[in-house]
Amino acid sequence: MSKRALISVSDKTNIIEFAKGLKESGFEILSTGGTLRSIAEAGIDVTPVDEVTGFPEMLDGRVKTLHPMIHGGLLGKRSNHEHLSQMEEHGIRSIDLVAVNLYPFKETVQKPDVSHQDIIENIDIGGPSMLRSAAKNFEDVLVVTGPTDYNRVLAAITSETDTYEFRQQLAAKVFRHTASYDAMIANYFLSQTEEQYPESYTVTYEKVQDLRYGENPHQQAAFYKEPIQSRPTLATAKQLHGKELSYNNIQDTNAAIEIVKEFAEPAAVAVKHMNPCGIGIGESISTAFERAYQADPTSIFGGIVACNRPVDAATAEQLSQIFLEIVVAPSFESQALEILTQKKNIRLLELDVTSDNKQSNRLTTVDGGALIQAYDAKEVSEADLEVVTNKQPTEQEINDMLFAWKAVKHVKSNAIVLAKDSQTIGVGAGQMNRIGAAEIAIKQAGDKSEGAVLASDAFFPMPDTVEAAAKAGIKAIIQPGGSKRDQDSVDVCNQFGIAMVYTKVRHFKH
């Protein structure tokens, strides 16, 4: 008795060639719906599934293969005499190969203006059931999820590569595939509710590429993306020039994108090791970049730059004068591309860095688990500021403080940022005490600190940071407030004529 293969696919790529190969290898082919028609129209002998089940397709195609004649043929173990006896008793023949790919749920849910009903109708039921049945019984059933495996399976059928390990590999692929498919469906339904943190949280990612290594050469790594992309992200960026991104490139570029999205004005951000080394805003992207560069001309070397406006020729000339790993921007003018592509080692990424990302959850893995939290989207405006000192800040100081506040939000805690005239001039990042971060920022700013403002991501537990700021000539301070010793810091500000405002918002970043 000939072997049987059941084929039911939504993606018809190379399916005719695969069916011909199976036929040449002696398989009887069973099929349904559009796949059946395609195979038959190609002149290949094919048996409709309803001839096997004795039931027609029904409920608008919702029920085709959900039948014991199909699943018995997939799940019956050939080495189990009781299974074989029961199959013979009920007239069930074995099915030896299944080729199924699923309804295009992912593609459907990403269509603009798609209806909820269309999304529902693209949830596959029979397909995953057949795949899982076949994969469970992988010792007896070859299972194929897509065109990339057709040639491998055809080769295995006629050679010694049809091994236990090969079949188990295909089965593992099935369970990853159906788990990912179900995760996308689960997350779609979750998005239709107000529930944020359910009892179980399902995520799935698709591989973008293997990476040369991770943070260090001895660490293996790969880059994955969310399968459903509802907004522009680094994973959807278009690379216009340069070699592939490294693990550290991806981390740093994402950090730069997160920061530059804070600003409505033309802005440029330079990042090293996921911390900003320079941020500038201006009336043009060229001016903004010049300010970001001058913020720290040393640290920007080998860094990543993000711009929230198209890169023009003037800005490209500035960028080309220094060694940069990556420049990411909404677009690059043709002259800018001509200038920058002359540098072999630079990567150019095109991405809409003005899109909103403030509604998304963020996931961080820990050993044995994960932390999930809402994106830190809290914004502070001039109206939110509480002046707590005798001195009132000037309009310029308020503007600089709000600018510095946006910057310090993205600096690793403990974080201090000094700013002046729409430009960061000192960044103290990742220190175990706040005064240490302040000392680093003040030292970096040097003489520029005279008349500058200081932003702190959290409150001052003692007045030492304010004292250091006073010695450096800082004229205004923005911080959350909330310490038991707030008044000590206020007193020092009043002593030295410094304006200080509270935001009542903390921006820890780990």
UniProtKB/Swiss-Prot annotation:
Matching InterPro entries: AICAR_Tfase_dup_dom_sf, Cytidine_deaminase-like, MGS-like_dom, MGS-like_dom_sf, PurH-like
SUPFAM superfamilies: Cytidine deaminase-like, Methylglyoxal synthase-like
Ranges for domain MGS-like: 1-145
Catalytic activity: (6R)-10-formyltetrahydrofolate + 5-amino-1-(5-phospho-beta-D-ribosyl)imidazole-4-carboxamide = 5-formamido-1-(5-phospho-D-ribosyl)imidazole-4-carboxamide + (6S)-5,6,7,8-tetrahydrofolate; IMP + H2O = 5-formamido-1-(5-phospho-D-ribosyl)imidazole-4-carboxamide
SMART domains for the chain: AICARFT_IMPCHas (SM00798), MGS (SM00851)
EC number in record: 2.1.2.3, 3.5.4.10
Pathway(s) of this molecule: Purine metabolism; IMP biosynthesis via de novo pathway; 5-formamido-1-(5-phospho-D-ribosyl)imidazole-4-carboxamide from 5-amino-1-(5-phospho-D-ribosyl)imidazole-4-carboxamide (10-formyl THF route): step 1/1; Purine metabolism; IMP biosynthesis via de novo pathway; IMP from 5-formamido-1-(5-phospho-D-ribosyl)imidazole-4-carboxamide: step 1/1
Keyword Ribonucleoprotein set for record: no
Gene Ontology BP terms: 'de novo' IMP biosynthetic process
A Pfam short name: AICARFT_IMPCHas
GO cellular component, one term: cytosol
Ranges annotated as spanning the membrane: none
GO MF annotation: an example: IMP cyclohydrolase activity
Keyword line: Hydrolase, Multifunctional enzyme, Purine biosynthesis, Transferase
NCBIfam families reported in the protein's UniProt record: PRK00881.1, purH
Family affiliation: Belongs to the PurH family.
Domains (record comment): The IMP cyclohydrolase activity resides in the N-terminal region.
Protein name: Bifunctional purine biosynthesis protein PurH
Species whose genome carries this gene: Oceanobacillus iheyensis (strain DSM 14371 / CIP 107618 / JCM 11309 / KCTC 3954 / HTE831)
Lineage: Bacteria, Bacillati, Bacillota, Bacilli, Bacillales
Gene name as annotated: purH
